[in-house]
Amino acid sequence: MADEIVPPATQLAAVSLENDGSTVQRAQFSNRVLIRTILDRPDGGAGLAGQTVRIGGWVKSGRDQGKRTFSFLAVNDGSCPANLQVMVDPSLYDVSNLVATGTCVTVDGVLKVPPKGKGTQQQIELNVVKVIDVGTVDASKYPLPKTKLTLETLRDVLHLRSRTNSISAVARIRNALAFATHSFFQEHSFLYIHTPIITTSDCEGAGEMFQATTLINYTERLEQDLIDNPPPTEADVEAARLIVIERGNVVAELKAAKASKEAITAAVAELKIAKETFAHIDERSRLRPGLPKKDGNIDYSKDFFGRQAFLTVSGQLQVETYACALSNVYTFGPTFRAENSHTSRHLAEFWMVEPEIAFADLEDDMNCAEAYVKYMCNWLLEKCYADMELMAKNFDSGCIDRLKLVASTPFGRITYTKAIELLEEAVAKGKEFDNNVEWGIDLASEHERYLTEVLFQKPLIVYNYPKGIKAFYMRLNDDEKTVAAMDVLVPKVGELIGGSQREERYDVIKKRIEEMGLPIEPYEWYLDLRRYGTVKHCGFGLGFERMILFATGLDNIRDVIPFPRYPGKADL
């Protein structure tokens, strides 16, 4: 094609490899080599000895050996958890400006196999021949010293914490799980649908939603306007009203006198202007500081969207509209809950993966959820093992074994009623829970973890929950006491996935909305899916941060999302 863009030859060369793998691979969009491409080789990079490369990264630690010998830098560029040992001859550069933790360096050097017995565990190191660029650090002020900081402390330096080994590993694990999510659903012919962040629907019916409004801006502008241009007085309104009457009388008199058409037309035009002026003056005279009100309530017709709007708590309802046309779909994006909760399991902003499957029932839903979770576990074991080893070493020694267990073990499946019976039996034998156990409760985290970690010792799917603790859109079972809902429970975190077969029967779902005290009007569009060509379908939601907690073994959800939002905190 005449307009085809041909990549430059240097760019093509940068991504080529010799058949024997002896040529180092350069980054495609940067004139450097990713440290991962050196250290992740089966030989640890030893086969690249003699190659000249350019690397860039941040100094994790440095040793200034004095003017007569090499200084050593441990450099990391974020592409992998391992650091590359870099040797700098003091004759090339003032190494005192290089050794501080956090210093950014770009250097050219020759890869060399370190002498045996040198003390390094790496198979390769870089002997610098030229220092290209340096981003210096004042070690006395740098917030991330060599000493290990707690994850809680790192939350106070969100803009820098990704430079630490732990948070950078979490970032790579998070990236891998996101990649795995898209890969799984794309491989199974699901379409990725972008659902809205701003919505007028409350999927959960909980009411704990962030409101999206411009009324505060409107109010601030109004208050300033009333200061700059004081509203008309009652006398101003009365004067404008009298002018309207006067202009009206003139028109009436001209018509009675059978005046010329031109005179009447001119008088009517003046009357129209008088009426418009009166309406404007009368409207401004009614303006008051504060939010606009109508019948004692906030008048949302003055808001940006002409009605109340919120940040979404779930993309499920919206993505269902596409499932009812395109069959298999999923959405993956941020959701928001205005819960004033400070626990280690709650965020105000978090990510959800929500697939919907048409022509499918609850069993299909459970099968898909199990396959998806296993796929993600295998993905981490195959593509992110070094990062998982770091998490196992520093935080949870059992995290890799847990991934292997979930990836290789068939999930158990029991009804909610059976789960309650098992918990009641445990209580009868002396097991103590903080939360009571009885039919009709929403299982607490301690119940879920006891089922998975103690009784079954593997992932568990609990299904057919009481309708009173589940959402209106879940399909009512024939017993009319339970709904076709399911939760996937895993060790470490408890509930990982919540899903259901959706209620496709118009009369039943309308009654459920009414029973839960929700207004019908906001859900009329959702009911249309049942009015016109209704279809059996199901879906589920996976809390993405919970999946990362499960994988990494970390205890606080604030440490597995780049920029955590929770009550009192919305930094950056």
Swiss-Prot record:
InterPro entries: Aa-tRNA-synt_II, aa-tRNA-synth_II, aa-tRNA-synth_II/BPL/LPL, Asn-tRNA-ligase, Asp/Asn-tRNA-synth_IIb, NA-bd_OB-fold, NA-bd_OB_tRNA, WHEP-TRS_dom. One of its GO terms (molecular function) is asparagine-tRNA ligase activity. Its main location: cytoplasm. Residues 53-131 bind DNA. It is an enzyme of class 6 (ligase). One of its GO terms (biological process) is embryo development ending in seed dormancy. Residues 236-292 form the WHEP-TRS domain. It comes from the Eukaryota. Its EC number is 6.1.1.22. PROSITE patterns: AA_TRNA_LIGASE_II (PS50862), WHEP_TRS_2 (PS51185). Pfam families: tRNA-synt_2, tRNA_anti-codon. It catalyses: tRNA(Asn) + L-asparagine + ATP = L-asparaginyl-tRNA(Asn) + AMP + diphosphate + H(+). The keyword Ligase applies. Keywords: Acetylation, Aminoacyl-tRNA synthetase, ATP-binding, Cytoplasm, DNA-binding, Ligase, Nucleotide-binding, Protein biosynthesis. The keyword Hydrolase does not apply. Disruption phenotype: Embryo defective. Developmental arrest of the embryo at the cotyledon stage. The modification N-acetylalanine is found at residue 2. It is found in: Cytoplasm, Cytosol. HAMAP family: Asn_tRNA_synth. Belongs to the class-II aminoacyl-tRNA synthetase family. This is Asparagine--tRNA ligase, cytoplasmic 1.
